[in-house]
């Protein structure tokens, strides 16, 4: 772990940097230690005081906001509350309060994974994560939805691996009062895979660590196949591994989970005109725009990487190749634009989260930098209109 001193006016800020090699060793150590973690029961995060209504009850809602972010794991997980994540939560609470009396209040929060360093260690959930999220669910009253990251349930594609099962058990305990119940219509039984609808927007959460799993894929496909698109004009998917990224997990590297997302879910998402993917894994902000055509005309899918939730920051490592994606989508005339690239140093990429404001089939995005990152303007401003109805 190295340090970099940033000068912000008269204020010197120390940023701790994590090299890709160190990040890889940390992930391997976390996975290896999960089996032998102490037997402590994970406390359930408190349910929101203002839960989402039944899907049918919100059918007429076309204007609201929600928050997205990811990668909150901290350097002191298991011994203290996550400090950097706490700064994020403080800012979120202020944003939720600011928007509460507007026409587009914040109705839920999405977290794309890596809640803690070692998801198999109950102490890390209990001492570093749960109480921070309680501030959102009880203090602000908003529903909170978490997708599992590789640090939460390991990156193993083997559903029965002991380390994965240990992490999954803790994840499910923490989220027991937040996500649909096991066996519910909007939950895949036995999996951390679920969906929900609010107003004109439908959200699917999947476990990208097992993106090659047939049972999960078929369930997601069935959810999308059966969707009332007259009502749900906006469909959003959130999960951990990005489709494209230019950090230590991307660039010339294509991880197995990423490859499975590209080959299996990308065509499915285009088929169903998914508006946006919200991911993390890379600890910075990045934005890709995918354009394609089908019998209904031109379409756009925004791929947002928002992994600035408190984990050690990453930097730009190189462009990923889009050649195979473009070749696979040749019939749909698929193309990609790298709209926002992360900076070349971790200190260029602040802790942040994203506010998405829905107004009919239009979505506006605002990136909010935190602490020394206040004023972060990746689009020469902090806001961007995401096309007209996904086109």
PLM features: what roles do these ranges have?
Residues 1-9:
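Bacterial N-terminal signal peptides that target proteins for export
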Residues 8-17:
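Bacterial N-terminal signal peptides
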Residues 19-34:
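Signal peptide processing junction and immediate N-terminal pro/mature segment
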Residues 33-123:
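N-terminal active-site segment of His-dependent metallophosphoesterases
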Residues 36, 328-391:
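A short C-terminal boundary segment appended to hydrolase-like catalytic domains
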Residues 42-51, 79, 120-235, 250-260, ...:
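Extended active-site neighborhood of metal-dependent phosphoesterases/phosphodiesterases
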Residues 66-68, 109-111, 146-147, 237, ...:
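Residue-level marker for buried hydrophobic side chains located in beta-strands
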Residues 71, 113-114, 149-150, 240, ...:
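Active-site glycine-centered loops adjacent to acidic/histidine catalytic or metal-binding residues
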